[in-house]
Amino acid sequence: MYCVLMKQESIGFDNRWIRGGKKVNQRERKKRTAKTESAVKTVEKAETVKVEQTKKAVVKAAKAEKVYNTRFEKKLDELRWLYMELYGNSSMFAELCDQMHRFYEERTDVLKKLDSKREADPDWYKKNDMLGMMFYIDNFAGNMKGVESKIDYLEKNNVNYIHLMPFLDTPKGRSDGGYAVADFRKVQENLGTMDELEELTGACHEKGISVCMDFVMNHTSEDHEWAKKARQGDGEYMSRYFFYDNSYIPSLYEKTVPQVFPTTAPGNFTWLPEIGHYVMTTFYPYQWDLNYRNPRVFNEMMYNFLFLANKGIDIIRIDAVPYIWKELNTSCRNLPQVHTIVRMMRLISEIVCPGILLLGEVVMEPEKVVPYFGTVEKPECHMLYNVTTMATTWHTVATRDVSLLKKQLDIVNGLPKDYVFLNYLRCHDDIGWGLDYATLKQEGIEERSHKKYLNDYFQGYTGESNSRGVLYNEDPVTGDARFCGTTASMCGIEKAGFEKDKAAMKRAIQMDVMLHAYMFMQSGIPVLYSGDEIGQVNDYSYKNDPDKVQDSRYIHRGAMHWDLAARADDPKTVEGQLFGQLDKLEKIRKKEKAFMTNADTWTVETWDNSILCIGRYYDGDKIYGLFNFSEYDKTAWINERDGLYKDLITGQEMEAAGVNIPAYGFYWLKKK
């Protein structure tokens, strides 16, 4: 009965009991088949995508390899010739080439793209919007992360190039302000990490800001791994420095090599009693000079250079360039081999990381500075500091006489336009009075007495001075010394603020702004020192710090006062007046094409020793800058009668002839 019923039910209901099961199974099989086919398609699609990605990666790698090979083949012959001339070691050269390729492969796609962009526009850093700012990371914002959080402030300052003062690992109390490096691949722990450096450079690049750092090539800290092994008597590492087991060779060097710090670190060698050897220490006893006669030293330092470049650094400041090659019976300064090394460094960077710029620190007279540009055909440094012009500017402030400054600018303006100087009023270092004393002597001014006058003036010891500051590394025998102080303090802002003298403050601010306006008119790239934009004065707290008290340069290395920076938008404050006027100058400079770095630049006779006139011309635009370095109103007796000019600051129209200029005043006159 059950079977019959089921049969009837199955007949009555389309055989669902018997055939329905088959239908369910068929549907399930179809679903499973569909899922399988879908999964297969997904896998096939993923494999296709993977294959395509692999193909793209292969094509991309091949393209990158082709780019590298093109650069390498173009530079190889000269690089090999220079290397073999200096070292004659083919195996070390082969190693160098292998490592260059490795560092190129490790360079990120973002940096490679930036390299290509800059290769296509080699004058990218010569634009009229290029404005730098230098600062110590801890003083400015505490650490790397802090700097990253202040990028908006940098943009507010119209800055698109920052120089991070030395931040690599150094021993506490023996750092020379960061220039005694113990590890070239480690950031000082209190400042951050290499990863955070890379994050900072990446964040800066997103905002169009280039990043500069110091690369100390001449020496390492005595705490460097090499120095530690050398101190243990390891010959391999001793050969990376200059070691001597008696005083004979050191005494020969001392006959011809000048002392850098005759009072604080006399001599050029330090005795190490634990190993019974002398080691060369041109700067401080804890900074051991590297021996670049050893190709291992050159190679390893280039690897450090490329490592840092791959962290996103755009500008490498080569510290103490003239000192890096040593020869007996010479001054060990500016020797030909130095130029060979810098040229090789330029070639290496153009192969591996052509977006990098080399900035040379050559604190010497102009005729010794200029050769570090190399030649137009075989360039060395992209940029050099305009050190002598900076010192001559402050000489002009103290004497109210622009004659020497005009001559100095004429020398700079007469150089090829490919040569780019970094112009600044103040930096982290002292001011050494390395002026053109041969010219001054023709005016009856003697070097020794004039240096004393300048140091007295800027310390505020002369009646006509409103400056404040201190001496550095004074030599009691010769009376020679260098000077330290911030721009604002040297202009009189510190004194006027202390004395609550409103008239003096107005005059000091006017001088400060005039000097910046003059700096912006020079041929080259202007660089601000952090704090100058708000008129920070000398910081005397260093005298209470046992690690700093012996180094008076810390007077102008004070921490950034963010409470003062908060007043930058208030025109009633000193900070607001300075910031607002500098901001206006910077924006005008960015707008006017006559401020391009490679514009024609020249000086014009004003027939008044207190007034400087600088002319600039580019692509049909002409601007004259007139600057009064005197506390009295003056007249510039220029006679440019080719039509009306417009002052870019006030909008006033006038002829560029017989121009009256107020005390510490200036004009930027553009031909209409």
Residue ranges and their predicted role:
Residues 2, 7-672:
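Active-site and adjacent substrate-binding regions of carbohydrate-active enzymes
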